[in-house]
């Protein structure tokens, strides 16, 4: 989504209600994260946990979407990214509701004994690949520090019985993630396949799992319409966030 109509800060991304600086983060604000933050179910949510928070994008989006008494905890391993996420939260309208912690999620415990109705993560995609220019980028891109089995285990330790654990992944990796999650006792409850247009195959999948079994609702979202304009579905989902939508 272009932000070129006005002179906006160049070290991040300006949304309607907040700004995300991301120049000190390995992974920048992108469509995947924005889709996930806008899509995750929030009915009945009182506590949100963002695993691998990066710049704090998801924590900020969920703070905007939820009631004034909802607490959002964001955990990020990388020191620089966690510091920037904390600064972004402090500069937002919801600074009193967002707590950013620099920690390894495997060792982290919430400041209060609680479980979360919503856990959200935009996790590393790939098991291995071409070495990255920095260890920070490698940590964000590859599952070397947070593999998917460990992520599912961590989420299970912190979620309520009726809660949802939501991720966004490439379709092929998402299908493998579903198999792994199912084998570990999770139940897929929501699935949205995301394609660039109606005529193209999906390239991303939004997934919501729960410890509790129930019907699984599946649908499809095209980002653009036949004339390359943003589709009605994409606009309805993300319109509260994109500045010029």
Curated annotation (Swiss-Prot):
> Where does the record place it?
Cytoplasm
GO terms (molecular function) for this protein are:
nucleic acid binding; tRNA (adenine-N6)-methyltransferase activity
Describe the reaction catalysed, as an equation: adenosine(37) in tRNA1(Val) + S-adenosyl-L-methionine = N(6)-methyladenosine(37) in tRNA1(Val) + S-adenosyl-L-homocysteine + H(+)
Its function, per the record, reads:
Specifically methylates the adenine in position 37 of tRNA(1)(Val) (anticodon cmo5UAC).
What protein family does this chain belong to? Belongs to the methyltransferase superfamily. tRNA (adenine-N(6)-)-methyltransferase family.
Superkingdom per UniProt: Bacteria
Database matches in InterPro entries: DNA_methylase_N6_adenine_CS, SAM-dependent_MTases_sf, Small_mtfrase_dom, tRNA_Adenine-N(6)_MTase, tRNA_adenine-N6_MeTrfase
* Enzyme Commission identifier(s): 2.1.1.223
Gene3D superfamilies with a match to the protein in the record: Vaccinia Virus protein VP39 (3.40.50.150)
Gene Ontology biological-process entries: methylation; tRNA processing
This protein's name: tRNA1(Val) (adenine(37)-N6)-methyltransferase
Which cellular component terms (GO) are annotated to the entry? Answer: cytoplasm
PANTHER family for this protein: TRNA1(VAL) (ADENINE(37)-N6)-METHYLTRANSFERASE
Keywords per UniProt: Cytoplasm, Methyltransferase, S-adenosyl-L-methionine, Transferase, tRNA processing
Primary localization class, coarse:
cytoplasm
* Native organism: Klebsiella pneumoniae (strain 342)
């Amino acid at each position: 989504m272009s932000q070129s109509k006005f002179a906006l800060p160049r070290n991040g991304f300006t949304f309607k209600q907040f700004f995300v600086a991301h120049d000190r983060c390995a992974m920048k604000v992108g469509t995947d994260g924005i889709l996930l933050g806008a899509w995750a179910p929030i009915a009945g949510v009182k506590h949100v946990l963002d695993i691998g928070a990066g710049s704090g994008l998801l924590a900020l989006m969920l703070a905007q979407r939820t009631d004034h008494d909802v607490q959002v905890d964001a955990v990020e391993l990388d020191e620089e990214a966690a510091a920037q996420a904390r600064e972004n939260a402090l500069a937002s309208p919801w600074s009193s509701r967002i707590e950013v912690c620099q920690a390894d999620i495997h060792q982290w415990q919430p400041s209060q004994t609680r479980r979360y109705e919503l856990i959200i993560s935009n996790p590393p995609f790939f098991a291995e690949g071409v070495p990255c220019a920095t260890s920070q980028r490698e940590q964000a891109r590859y599952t070397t520090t947070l593999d998917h089995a460990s992520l599912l285990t961590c989420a299970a330790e912190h979620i309520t019985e009726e809660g949802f654990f939501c991720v966004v992944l490439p379709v092929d990796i998402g299908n493998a993630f579903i198999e792994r999650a199912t084998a570990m006792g999770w139940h897929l409850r929501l699935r949205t396949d995301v394609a660039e247009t109606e005529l193209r195959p999906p390239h991303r999948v939004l997934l919501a799992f729960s410890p509790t079994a129930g019907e699984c609702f599946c649908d499809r979202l095209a980002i653009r319409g036949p004339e390359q304009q943003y589709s009605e579905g994409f606009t309805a989902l993300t319109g509260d966030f994109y500045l010029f939508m």
